[in-house]
């Protein structure tokens, strides 16, 4: 039995805080070839997850809030936000499923946020994700501007 408890969430959150990318995965699947990828994803505010989609092969992806507050954002082909959901288990907003071929990303809105993520496998880094050409590359100086634009949109809508 794999146990997901406060100790595990604290452990992965602490690793995310120390990571240059401000996030950390904890995989439950044993092999990249597993047909169901399951993981914890600890994300700190300021971490940039470049918008991407999963197609060829198509993959569904679901996110569930275990701790903290996280925004899951969907975009159209031009980079306009089409929909978003704030995941916050304390407000009974637990999760979302993102359809294959859908541009999406996520942003942490609170320190020590952790999601449980489930995605169709297998994982092959060469074809797992298609990154959006309209979004800055990870590590670029424009990623903060992009994050701020999304946060501004979300806060304006609330």
Regions found by a protein language model. Give the residues of each.
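A short, N-terminal "cap"/entry segment at the start of jelly-roll beta-barrel domains
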Residues: 1-37, 84-89, 144-158
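His/acidic/aromatic-lined binding-pocket segments of jelly-roll/cupin-type domains
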Residues: 40-41, 60-65, 96, 106-107
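Conserved short histidine dyad/triad with adjacent acidic residue
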Residues: 40-59
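Glycine- and acidic-residue-biased ligand/ion/polar-headgroup-sensing regions
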Residues: 58-78
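Double-stranded beta-helix
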Residues: 80-81, 105-158
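Short acidic-glycine-tyrosine-enriched beta hairpin
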Residues: 62, 76-104
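Short beta-strand His + acidic residue motifs that chelate non-heme Fe in jelly-roll/DSBH
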Residues: 51, 72-74, 96-98, 104-109, ...
């Amino acid at each position: 039995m794999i146990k997901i408890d406060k100790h595990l969430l604290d452990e992965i959150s602490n690793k995310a805080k120390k990571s240059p990318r401000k996030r950390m995965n904890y995989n439950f699947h044993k092999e990249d070839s597993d047909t169901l990828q399951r993981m914890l994803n600890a994300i700190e505010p300021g971490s940039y997850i470049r918008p991407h989609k999963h197609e060829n092969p198509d993959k569904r992806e679901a996110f569930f809030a275990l701790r903290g507050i996280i925004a899951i954002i969907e975009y159209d082909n031009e980079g306009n936000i089409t929909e978003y959901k704030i995941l916050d288990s304390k407000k009974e907003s637990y999760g979302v499923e993102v359809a294959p071929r859908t541009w999406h990303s996520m942003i942490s809105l609170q320190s020590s946020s952790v999601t449980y993520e489930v995605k169709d496998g297998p994982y092959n880094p060469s074809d797992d994700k298609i990154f959006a050409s309209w979004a800055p590359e990870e590590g670029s100086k424009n990623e903060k501007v992009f994050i701020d634009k999304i946060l501004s949109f979300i806060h304006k809508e609330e």
